[in-house]
């Protein structure tokens, strides 16, 4: 079956243009003519396999990673980096357009194309295959930081922990003394609960909105970001590209100040740590209650209020009361 690759969507797939049904095609570039084979067929869409590029885009390039197309990590290495960024901008614009929101010109914040990724998940010692349960053994990754690659090189595939483990490796890690490998390897296991700290003091009883949360000291990681210390759980989410994070923070938090600021989907409070310098009060909303524990630690000396609920729940049940207590944002 021959189709023309249309617009790119989140995840890197293109949607076939000349098809009655929506078909997602990996490893293509908008405008390319490709031969495909349907791998999975669903009611509203299909997922295809890219068999052959009949008419190549001028933006197509040779991927620099030997595992590209095998592991499920990267999706755009077949596209020249500058055009990748243009496609990402268009994908973001499309997302706003679908919600009826017009956006001004989008500023691109980018970093190096290699050696930037600090956060990895390994499954039985390897990476998951593209859209499969196959385990891909790797001993290096061009996108990984030096610290992560040192681990992959020194610990053979067969000697790595089984199950799913989370790795965070970066020169920015401050919780590991200099002279030691700057990497946190966290295995998923039964969590041991430790007390929540608020304003530097232990709470005898967690507040209701923190109930059911935990903090695992063995997987805790502290990084230095623009001279501020931020602690998070390596088992959870944290930005994997610290270079871009450090470039983004001044653009997001700089030049604004006031009484109250709302940090929706705050995670461990990364941006709130910087917003606290120019706002009197921070309100954090994060559905991952375990991340809220670290946000409390990171904002311990600052006036703030945290909610361990989803964004829609906060808007529906907490926003009105919060505004009455704190004032408008």
Where are these regions (language model features)?
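Short, conserved phosphate/pyrophosphate- and ester-handling motifs at nucleotide-, phospho-/glycolipid
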Residues: 31, 144, 241
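Rossmann-like S-adenosyl-L-methionine
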Residues: 4-14, 172-329
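Extended interfacial segments that mediate partner engagement and assembly in macromolecular machines
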Residues: 51-63, 69-162
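Conserved "cap/hinge" positions at secondary-structure junctions
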Residues: 38-40, 124, 169
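Terminal RNA-binding accessory module
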Residues: 1-63, 67
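Short, acidic/hydrophobic/Gly-rich beta-strand patch recurrent on exposed beta strands
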Residues: 14-19, 126-131, 295
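A short glycine-rich, hydrophobically flanked beta-strand micro-motif that places a catalytic Asp/Glu
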Residues: 104-106, 162-171, 183, 263
């Amino acid at each position: 079956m021959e189709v023309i690759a249309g617009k790119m969507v989140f995840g890197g797939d293109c949607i076939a243009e000349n098809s009655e049904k929506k078909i997602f095609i990996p490893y293509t570039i908008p405008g390319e003519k490709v031969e495909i084979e349907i791998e999975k067929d669903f009611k509203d869409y299909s997922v295809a396999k890219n068999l052959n590029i009949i008419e190549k885009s001028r933006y197509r390039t040779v991927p620099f990673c030997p595992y590209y197309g095998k592991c499920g990590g990267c999706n755009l290495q077949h596209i020249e980096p500058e055009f990748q960024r243009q496609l990402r901008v268009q994908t973001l614009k499309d997302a706003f357009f679908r919600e009826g929101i017009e956006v001004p010109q989008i500023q691109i914040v980018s970093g190096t194309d290699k050696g930037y990724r600090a956060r990895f998940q390994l499954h039985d010692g390897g990476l998951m295959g593209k859209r499969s349960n196959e385990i891909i053994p790797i001993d290096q990754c061009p996108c990984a930081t030096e610290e992560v690659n040192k681990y992959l090189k020194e610990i053979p595939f067969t000697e790595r922990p089984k199950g799913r483990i989370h790795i965070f490796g970066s020169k920015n890690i401050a919780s590991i003394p200099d002279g030691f490998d700057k990497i946190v390897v966290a295995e998923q296991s039964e969590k041991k609960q430790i007390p929540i700290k608020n304003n530097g003091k232990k709470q005898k009883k967690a507040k209701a909105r923190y109930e059911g949360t935990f903090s695992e000291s063995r997987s805790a990681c502290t990084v230095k970001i623009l001279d501020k210390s931020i602690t998070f759980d390596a088992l959870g989410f944290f930005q994997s590209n610290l270079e871009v994070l450090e470039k983004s923070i001044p653009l997001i938090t700089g030049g604004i100040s006031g009484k109250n600021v709302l940090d929706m989907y705050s995670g461990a409070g990364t941006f709130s740590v910087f917003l606290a310098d120019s706002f009197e009060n921070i309100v954090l909303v994060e559905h991952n209650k375990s991340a809220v524990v670290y946000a409390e630690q990171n904002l311990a000396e600052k006036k703030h209020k945290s909610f361990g609920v989803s964004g829609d729940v906060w808007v529906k049940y907490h926003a009105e009361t919060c505004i009455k207590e704190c004032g408008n944002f």
